Regions:
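A conserved mid-protein helix/loop that constitutes part of the nucleotide-sugar donor-binding site
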Residues: 18-25, 179-193, 211-214
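Aromatic "clamp/platform" in nucleotide-sugar-dependent glycosyltransferases that forms part
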Residues: 255
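A charged, aromatic-enriched C-terminal amphipathic alpha-helix characteristic of glycosyltransferases
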Residues: 162, 311-346, 352
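Short alpha-helical donor nucleotide-sugar binding micro-motif in glycosyltransferases
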Residues: 234, 242-247
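Conserved acidic donor-binding segment of nucleotide-sugar-dependent glycosyltransferases
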Residues: 287-300, 307-314
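Short, structured helix-loop element that forms part of the nucleotide-activated donor/catalytic region
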Residues: 44-46, 199-227, 238-239, 243
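Conserved donor-binding/catalytic core segment of Leloir-type glycosyltransferases
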Residues: 4, 165-182, 187-201
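Short hydrophobic beta-strand element within catalytic cores of glycosyltransferases
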Residues: 272-276
Length: 362
């Protein structure tokens, strides 16, 4: 396959988007070449058959200059290369901008989008795409016959269990940007009613409303968590993984519509993970009562589940973690995602295999 790929950032140091480099590395052996047009180019160790072209955000270029650079790269590549497909990763903007040119050449676009946010930009990108792929049926905000559900792609070799550090039995970890939609305030209040310590991993998103981090710190003080709550800021992936490995319990309060890969990363590390999004229920199995709360504001329910998990013998918590990891391996591994994505790029449909997730597609 000869693949054109659009993404928002190609940078191993990006705290949110660096994971997508693992997708590129896994796709590369199946492709003659991959050409990436990205909004932001940073450091990236990629295979020899992958070439990156940037619109120039890393150089501080204005929007009009970035638009001009995008079309300059696209037109030159279309004049000198042949493509079998285009994959737009969280880039409905580029999918929409390139759509007429690609369609005229018979190049079909597959758009990956996993967020509940609706926008005119997304509608245009969807209109210009042959297929849309998302992690879960609930993680794409529009109903469309174009949607194919392919799961997340978690690097389960990287996110894997290790012998835990001696942090006792009450360390709670929540990973995600500091934002109201992630409901860190719920976790702070819930942990405050237990003997646990809390680590909030992640910083405020650039351009987000100011003051949320300060509000969280104030809330921690109000409930007596000043000495038991750490704010680490943004960390590289290896450091995030190390926090997962130290954790007794991981928490993810992302609501319906946000099928958050951070919850899958902690599960892949073998950590009992409490969630509030029922889309995760198939992974929780018989322990759903212990790992699924009523919603992102359910402080009492989260506190109850934390206390019950803290009270379990370490061996039982480890057994829960193993079952969660096995579910991620089965449904959301990088190999499985690569197989499903390549099938959609080639045929528009999921593969006929145990990895197909056909029961969740629309």
């Amino acid at each position: 396959m000869r693949l054109l790929l659009f993404n928002l950032a190609t940078d191993v140091n990006d705290p949110v988007l660096a994971f997508a480099l693992a997708w590129v590395r896994r796709l590369a052996p199946h492709c003659e070449y991959i050409d990436i047009i990205t909004m932001y180019r940073g450091d990236a160790d990629l295979p020899a058959n992958v070439t990156v072209y940037s619109a120039g955000r890393e150089r501080g270029l204005s929007k009009p200059r970035r638009v001009a650079n995008f079309y300059r790269h696209l037109l030159r590549l279309m004049a000198t290369r042949r493509y079998d497909a285009c994959f737009a990763h969280m880039m409905p903007l580029f999918a929409g901008m390139a759509g007429p040119l690609l369609s005229a050449r018979g190049i079909r676009t597959v758009l990956w989008y996993t967020h509940r946010q609706r926008s005119r930009q997304l509608r245009l990108g969807m209109a210009m795409s042959w297929r849309v792929v998302s992690a879960d049926a609930t993680s794409f905000p529009y109903e469309t016959d174009k949607l194919r559900v392919i799961g997340h792609g978690i690097d389960t070799d990287f996110y894997a269990p290790a012998a835990p550090a001696d942090w006792g039995d009450t360390l709670v970890v929540q990973v995600g940007r500091l934002a109201a939609i992630k409901h860190q305030a719920t976790t702070i209040q819930a942990v405050a009613g237990t003997a646990g310590e809390l680590a909030l991993i992640g910083g405020a998103q650039a351009g987000s409303a100011s003051g949320y981090e300060e509000m969280l710190k104030e809330r921690a003080g109000q409930v007596g968590m000043n000495q038991r709550c750490r704010f680490t800021g943004d960390l590289p992936a290896a450091a995030v993984r190390d926090w997962y490995r130290r954790a007794t319990v991981a928490v993810n309060m992302s609501p319906v519509g946000l099928f958050d890969k951070a919850a899958l990363e902690s599960m892949a590390c073998g950590v009992p993970t409490i969630v509030c999004n029922p889309a995760f229920a198939p992974l929780l199995g018989e322990r759903a009562d212990l790992l699924l709360t009523a919603g992102p504001d359910d402080v009492a329910g989260l506190r109850d589940r934390l206390e019950r998990l803290f009270a379990l013998p370490p061996e039982e918590r480890a057994a829960i973690g193993r079952r969660l990891r096995n579910g991620v391996l089965r449904e959301h591994s990088l190999d499985g995602l690569s197989e499903r994505l390549l099938a959609v790029l080639r045929t528009g449909e999921l593969p006929e295999s145990p990895h197909s997730r056909r029961s969740m597609s629309t």
